[in-house]
């Protein structure tokens, strides 16, 4: 079925749930009026429905390939990217000084989710550029900004990030790539990088790589890593793409999904690069890009889930099988209780994860606009939750959508299986979801749980405002908050990080589950008619949110039983 952008959900969330009004009240974003954001979402929806969605199957059926050292993309991808670039969608939140729109990240987040639902493999290209733009805005010299930012924002050039090496995956500090100073302000960069999304393409005039490498004499580990900007073509005196640099695409990976997106093995052989940020400051600079990408990847999961849900719903409304168990039913499988359960679970989880991601974006915008540490800390706390829960939901919804299709779900022609194949990697790249959870219970709780407990307090206060209308749901949310607070206290009092890490994933999931209940309750409160928002909230809070009980028990179980079984016993 054709993709339809869920504009009603975005506008409802902006107006009633995530607090975009606070962002609009700041001096920085005062021009982001309701009329403007609605118009932007409408135009983005048209782009996704009419231009990007038709490319979804094309990229899957005709994967990118390498020809004479150049990546060739599926038919229509070049025109699709051109439409994205010409519409200004790459630079939505970028600095207007360099050609960006200067819009709130919250609006960009909604648009990125729509693009991911329409064609995830193509959306990866502008997402990588957006992350690089933000990293350069924060860390690059003025000379680099003046040359590269206008080109990246316009889409004339595209950007990538190069972290991973064969021996250095999650342990980035183990990388071997090196850089040596040339004496003229440039550096010679050498090494091999793997898993580079959109490491090359056939529609941009230049591809700009952000590469992590180590300078001579630099300390071991992440403290010795620096960041370099290494373009495919060196800019000439006019700032245009000039002579070829000493780098190449060695090969493309043959992947489970995302066939339209080239995943490259990159080789740098004394390639010319420029230092971004200070020597040894590579991880700090790269994390700017990665945090941008982590929220974006969470939205990729949600977007893929939305596309899968729409496919499943259309199939359920059309497929007739068995006798309808409800009077006045449609006669299709949507009448069957288990199918209805699956559809409601998908819809409720998508709403919850979407609301969490947009709330994270609001915190980012408020931190940017006000400079207040409280907002920045909240954004940092919500980022791993948004990434992990958004991608988990995307995977689960895509799998459930396939189940709704029955046997037709595994027949490629229906398109249902593609969502499952495409979305699976989102729980792995930009930091696995396990690493997101470890980050949450370690770095993000170095404040003794201040941000976590502040969020719990806020959920309880907002729930109390709904008690007169929804006493039963409010009681459920309150009980969940008390259990979450207890688990938070246990984690923050545990000094052995490995004991925390053993329960990190279930803790993150439980926090997201309860945040989702908070978002649904806020939606129900804003739905004065007792309509679909209230009904969906009741379904989520009564049927899905209770998962937190087992999760929090797991989160507080420690690590001892994990190591009670020996490696030999695991293999026996």
Q: Which role fits each region the language model picked out?
A:
Residues 1-123, 147, 557-572:
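Amphipathic, small/basic residue-rich leader segments at the start of a protein or domain
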Residues 4, 188, 258, 359, ...:
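Alpha-helix capping/hinge segments and adjacent helical runs
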Residues 28-31, 61-74, 285-296, 310-347, ...:
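Glycine-rich cofactor-pocket loops
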Residues 64, 77, 128-129, 140-177, ...:
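Internal maturation/activation junctions in enzymes
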Residues 98, 447, 458-572:
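C-terminal amphipathic alpha-helical interaction region
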Residues 108, 179-182, 257-287, 319-331, ...:
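Flexible glycine/proline-rich, aromatic-decorated loop/lid segments
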Residues 186, 190-244:
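A short core secondary-structure module
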Residues 195-197, 234-250, 255, 262-293, ...:
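A glycine-rich, basic-preceded beta-loop-alpha segment at the flavin cofactor/substrate interface
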């Amino acid at each position: 079925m054709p993709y339809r952008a869920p504009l009603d959900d975005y506008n409802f969330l902006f107006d009633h749930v995530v607090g975009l009004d606070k962002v609009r009240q700041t001096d920085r974003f005062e021009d982001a009026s309701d009329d403007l954001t609605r118009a932007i979402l409408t135009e983005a929806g048209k782009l996704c429905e009419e231009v990007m969605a038709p490319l979804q199957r094309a990229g899957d059926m005709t994967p990118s390939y390498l020809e004479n050292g150049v990546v060739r993309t599926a038919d229509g991808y070049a025109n699709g990217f051109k439409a994205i670039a010409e519409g200004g969608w790459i630079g939505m939140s970028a600095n207007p000084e360099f050609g960006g729109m200067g819009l709130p990240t919250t609006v960009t987040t909604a648009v990125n989710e729509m693009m991911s639902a329409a064609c995830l493999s193509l959306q990866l290209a502008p997402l990588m550029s957006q992350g690089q733009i933000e990293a350069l805005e924060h860390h690059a010299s003025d000379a680099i900004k003046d040359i590269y930012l206008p080109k990246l924002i316009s889409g004339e050039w595209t950007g990538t990030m190069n972290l991973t090496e064969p021996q250095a995956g999650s342990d980035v500090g183990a990388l071997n790539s090196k850089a040596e100073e040339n004496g003229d302000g440039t550096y010679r960069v050498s090494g091999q990088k793997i898993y580079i999304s959109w490491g090359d393409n056939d529609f941009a005039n230049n591809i700009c790589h952000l590469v992590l490498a180590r300078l001579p004499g630099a300390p071991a580990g992440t403290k010795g890593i620096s960041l370099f900007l290494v373009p495919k073509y060196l800019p000439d005196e006019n700032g245009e793409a000039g002579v070829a640099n000493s780098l190449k695409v060695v090969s493309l990976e043959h992947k489970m999904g995302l066939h339209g997106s080239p995943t490259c093995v990159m080789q740098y052989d004394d390639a010319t690069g420029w230092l971004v940020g200070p020597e040894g400051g590579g991880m700090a600079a790269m994390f700017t890009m990665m945090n941008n990408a982590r929220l974006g990847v969470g939205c990729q999961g949600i977007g893929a889930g939305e596309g899968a849900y729409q496919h499943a719903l259309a199939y359920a409304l059309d497929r007739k099988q068995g006798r309808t168990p409800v009077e006045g039913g449609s006669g299709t499988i949507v009448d069957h209780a288990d199918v209805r359960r699956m559809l409601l679970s998908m819809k409720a989880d998508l709403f919850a994860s979407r609301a969490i991601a947009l709330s994270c974006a609001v915190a980012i915008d408020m931190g940017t606009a006000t400079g207040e540490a409280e907002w920045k800390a909240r954004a940092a706390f919500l980022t791993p939750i948004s990434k992990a829960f958004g991608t988990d939901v995307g995977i689960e919804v895509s799998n459930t959508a396939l189940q709704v299709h029955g046997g037709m779900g595994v027949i490629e022609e229906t398109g249902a299986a593609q969502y499952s194949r495409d979305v699976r990697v989102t729980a792995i790249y930009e930091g696995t979801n396990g690493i997101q959870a470890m980050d949450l219970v370690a770095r993000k709780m170095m404040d003794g749980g201040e941000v976590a407990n502040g969020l719990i307090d806020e959920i309880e206060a907002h729930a109390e405002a709904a008690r007169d209308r929804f006493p039963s749901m409010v009681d459920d949310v309150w009980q969940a908050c008390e259990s979450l607070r207890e688990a938070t206290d246990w984690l923050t009092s545990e000094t052995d990080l490995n004991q925390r890490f053993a329960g990190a994933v279930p803790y993150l999931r439980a926090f997201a589950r309860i945040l989702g209940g908070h978002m649904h309750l806020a939606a129900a409160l804003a739905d004065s008619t007792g309509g679909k928002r209230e009904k969906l909230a009741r379904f989520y809070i009564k049927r899905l949110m209770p998962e937190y009980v087992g999760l929090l028990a797991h989160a507080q179980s420690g690590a001892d039983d994990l190591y009670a079984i020996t490696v030999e016993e695991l293999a026996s």
